[in-house]
Amino acid sequence: MRLAYVTETYPPEINGVALTVDRFVRGLRTRGHAVDLVRPRQPHESECESRSEWRSPGIPLPMYRDLRIGLPLISRLTKRWSVSRPQLVHVATEGPLGWAAIRAARTIGVPVTSDFRTNFDQYSEHYGFGWLRGIVGGYLKHFHNATDRTFVPTLALSKALT
């Protein structure tokens, strides 16, 4: 199977999502799947645009400087996937790059799946942005309901999207 895997976080970043995505991508490739990894380029990394990976331009998050979010370059993704069409686009994170991936996949008629693992709306209170909780929760619902399927680890998280 040929699939595109889109994430805002990937090693050398060290966090649960980055490490899980890395294991998943390596596992798919080991099993013979062609995986086009799309992720933001880190400051110390060179540009990379090959058949198996694209490091998109990105910007650092203000409160998490070690993490860069990808710019929402819909037309660039649409062109990339029109040339080398995946059978499926999977979006692991809900940032601008993930949203662009959903839009690009829809433009060329490729099915899209996503992961919902982190309640960022609940995190907003922890970081002093509790007033954003409803907005963030609404965005997460909108994001995941724009995909064909969303993978969740618990029934409670599934219900949070309805």
Give each language-model segment a name:
Residues 3, 89, 150:
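Receiver (REC) domain switch-region micro-motif
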Residues 52-57, 107-109, 129-133:
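Short, hinge-like loop/turn segments at secondary-structure boundaries
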